[in-house]
């Protein structure tokens, strides 16, 4: 044996263990996504790049929703995001509303909306029309 000693091939190779999430520069867990893809019976085999890509997409969507919800919370002078802020963020964004159109958010409420027919009619005041009738 040229290697000598008790150290096998794995000990020297795993000196600096690095997760797949950190390799990809992601915060979402690539390993967990890979495990869920395998256990979910979506396909017989799962490629190595699929969980990385899916974790990146999920992280982007979460960041986008939290960004908009944070803006909604700040507009309401709050420092904590509540389900109402998530609802406002998703429903006011055209693409997110299309993606999550059939999703119900608990304690989210509804968007404030008054139909145009129910609003009071705006009367166009003209300077010559009203003054002429009152000058008699």
UniProtKB/Swiss-Prot annotation:
One of its GO terms (cellular component) is nucleus. Residues 1-24 are annotated as: Disordered. One of its GO terms (biological process) is DNA repair. SMART domains: H2A. It is found in: Nucleus; Chromosome. The modification N5-methylglutamine is found at residue 107. Pfam families: Histone, Histone_H2A_C. A motif ([ST]-Q motif) lies at residues 133-134. The modification N6-acetyllysine is found at residues 6, 10. The [ST]-Q motif constitutes a recognition sequence for kinases from the PI3/PI4-kinase family. The nucleosome is a histone octamer containing two molecules each of H2A, H2B, H3 and H4 assembled in one H3-H4 heterotetramer and two H2A-H2B heterodimers. The octamer wraps approximately 147 bp of DNA. This is Histone H2A. It comes from Pyricularia oryzae (strain 70-15 / ATCC MYA-4617 / FGSC 8958). The gene is HTA1.
């Amino acid at each position: 044996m040229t290697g000598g000693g008790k150290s096998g091939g794995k000990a020297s190779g795993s000196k600096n263990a690095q997760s797949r999430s950190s390799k990809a520069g992601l915060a979402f867990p690539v390993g967990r996504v890979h495990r869920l893809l395998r256990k979910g019976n979506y396909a017989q085999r799962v490629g190595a790049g699929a969980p990385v890509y899916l974790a990146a997409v999920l992280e982007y969507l979460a960041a986008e929703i939290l960004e908009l919800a944070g803006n909604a919370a700040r507009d309401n002078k709050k420092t904590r995001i509540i389900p109402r802020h998530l609802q406002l963020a998703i429903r006011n964004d055209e693409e997110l509303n299309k993606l999550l159109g059939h999703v119900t958010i608990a304690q989210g409420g509804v968007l404030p909306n008054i139909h145009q027919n129910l609003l009071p009619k705006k009367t166009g005041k003209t300077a010559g029309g009203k003054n002429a009738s009152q000058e008699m």
